[in-house]
């Protein structure tokens, strides 16, 4: 049976020594008599939708099982980074910090060196059997959860499948109306977008600004074996910077052709989410790289009030040649399969207990609590062992959306310290059948060209960040100019590449290649 559901020894108190065989200690529950509290500092992933995480029934059930109180401390929504830095500077720490330390001012190793966090390597190897089982079952998880030193510094949360939440999509009802097939090749896309334009859809293909203000037509990046950041050279397997490669120039040339033909929204660089959604809702635009919830669900629900036939369909990632397997190369220089990391601080009086509490959520039982909630109330188990949410969640009597209703019981859309279960995520995130179908279509691609998201060595981090901030800003400016024709892909390309090189690309490339080698050696 799962370690998470063993109750053979009902006496309170956790084992405190490694077993004689050197195997990790299997905890017996409860771990305490309800007289111990573990404080956890973390962002409110629900952005205020949950007023108090201690009221979520999954955590209440876990506390009862473990005999330990879990108390959440959350910085105010909108000022998380500032409050996190103040908490670190204060010297007064909780027992556990759950955070993405890869994006904080100091990373895990630096916080251990500074005396804020414990090096958890021995704690994890001794008291986290469920977590170790997750690492052993997946090579990508193991590498991401391992520091360059070979140590386990924290417990990572993981995503069970490639974290794909957006991809190519087009109006299925219009394909049918105009007698068009689903586009597969770039030539197919050119034809489909042209027919849409001829039928009164002003700018068939659109995009908009990402949260960081950047703008990319992700639709074709993978088609041309490139990325808007670091990627692997398809010929040599070496790390290269996508935006200065010939493949990237070919990608830009295709976008420039579409722009000149009037197939691309001329305001693409200025669209915020509202503007982009408005164009896709009223039919001025009919295709793009769309997100499952923010675009496909929201736009479809709004448009169907006046057009019941309105439907988006997820398309395969475009290819150059008929019959070629679609490729998916994640943008922004690689992809983590892991989210936040849970680390025990030096202020924790019982690090063993804290580790065992965190480890419980990696057991099948603990993970089910976080993803599904309470059996019979928020979910049921089918005869074949699969689970599904109850009507109380999917058709809530109080009018709550499924995403709102589940928060009384569980957090399937927000990782705590769990492996995100694909089934629960899909049932919750994809309430329209076309959303689930789109995600499956986007995942049906060759993912082997992806490089992992890498962490540059601490001593090079400042230099790397300064170089890449300058380069990224310049590349974004030129990207828009090349697409719109303000810059010429023949006359101006060499000067563009030389400018990027002159900003220190060689040094950044060296740091990135070094990080890749260390990752591969883990």
Language model features with spans:
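Helix-loop-helix "hinge/cap" segment bordering the ligand-binding cleft or interdomain interface
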Residues: 121, 147-215, 230-284, 342-353, ...
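Conserved N-terminal structural module of periplasmic/extracytoplasmic solute-binding proteins
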Residues: 1-188, 216, 225-231, 236-243, ...
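Extracytoplasmic/periplasmic substrate-binding proteins
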Residues: 36, 44-57, 162-169, 176-182, ...
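Glycine-rich, aromatic-lined ligand/substrate-binding cores of catalytic
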Residues: 257-259, 276-299, 307-310, 316-326, ...
């Amino acid at each position: 049976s799962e370690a998470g559901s063993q109750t053979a020894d009902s006496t309170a108190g956790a084992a405190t020594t490694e077993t004689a065989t050197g195997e990790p200690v299997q905890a017996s529950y409860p771990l305490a008599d309800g007289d111990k509290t573990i404080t956890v500092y973390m962002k409110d992933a629900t952005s205020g939708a949950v007023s108090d995480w201690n009221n979520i029934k999954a955590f209440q059930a876990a506390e009862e099982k473990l005999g330990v109180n879990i108390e959440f401390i959350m910085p105010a929504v909108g000022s998380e980074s500032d409050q996190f830095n103040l908490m670190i500077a204060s010297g007064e720490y909780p027992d556990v910090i759950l955070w993405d330390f890869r994006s904080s001012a100091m990373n895990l190793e630096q916080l251990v060196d500074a005396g804020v966090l414990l090096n958890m390597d021995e704690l994890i190897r001794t008291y986290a059997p469920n977590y170790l089982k997750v690492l052993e079952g997946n090579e990508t998880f193991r590498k991401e959860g391992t520091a360059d030193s070979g140590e386990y510094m924290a417990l990572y949360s993981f995503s069970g499948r490639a974290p794909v939440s957006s991809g190519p999509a087009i109006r299925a009802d219009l394909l049918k109306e105009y007698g068009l097939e689903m586009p597969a090749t770039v030539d197919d896309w050119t034809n489909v977008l042209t027919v849409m334009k001829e039928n009164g859809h002003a700018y068939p293909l659109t995009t908009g600004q990402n949260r960081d203000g950047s703008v990319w037509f992700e639709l074709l990046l993978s088609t041309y074996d490139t990325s808007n950041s670091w990627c692997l050279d398809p010929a040599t397997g070496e790390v290269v910077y996508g935006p200065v490669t010939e493949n990237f120039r070919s990608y830009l040339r295709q976008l420039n052709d579409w722009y000149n033909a009037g197939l691309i929204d001329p305001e693409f660089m200025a669209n915020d989410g509202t503007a982009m959604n408005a164009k896709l809702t009223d039919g001025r635009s009919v295709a793009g790289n769309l997100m499952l919830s923010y675009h496909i669900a929201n736009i479809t629900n709004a448009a169907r009030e006046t057009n019941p036939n309105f439907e988006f369909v997820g398309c395969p990632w475009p290819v150059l040649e008929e019959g070629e397997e679609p490729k998916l190369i994640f943008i922004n220089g690689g992809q983590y399969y892991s989210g936040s990391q849970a680390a025990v601080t030096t202020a924790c009086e019982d690090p063993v207990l804290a580790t065992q509490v965190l480890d419980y959520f990696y057991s099948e039982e603990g993970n089910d609590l976080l993803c599904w909630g309470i059996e019979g109330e928020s979910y049921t188990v089918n005869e074949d062992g699969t689970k599904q949410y109850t009507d109380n969640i999917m058709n809530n009597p109080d009018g709550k959306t499924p995403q709102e209703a589940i928060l009384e019981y569980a957090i399937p859309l927000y990782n705590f310290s769990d492996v995100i279960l694909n089934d629960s995520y899909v049932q919750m995130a994809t309430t329209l059948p076309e959303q689930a179908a789109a995600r499956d279509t986007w995942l049906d691609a060759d993912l082997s060209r992806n490089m992992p998201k890498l962490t540059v060595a601490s001593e090079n981090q400042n230099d790397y960040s300064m170089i890449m901030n300058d380069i990224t800003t310049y590349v974004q400016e030129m990207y828009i100019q090349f697409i719109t024709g303000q810059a010429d892909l023949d006359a101006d390309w060499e000067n563009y590449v030389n400018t990027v090189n002159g900003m220190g690309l060689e040094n950044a490339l060296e740091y990135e290649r070094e990080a890749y080698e260390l990752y591969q050696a883990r």
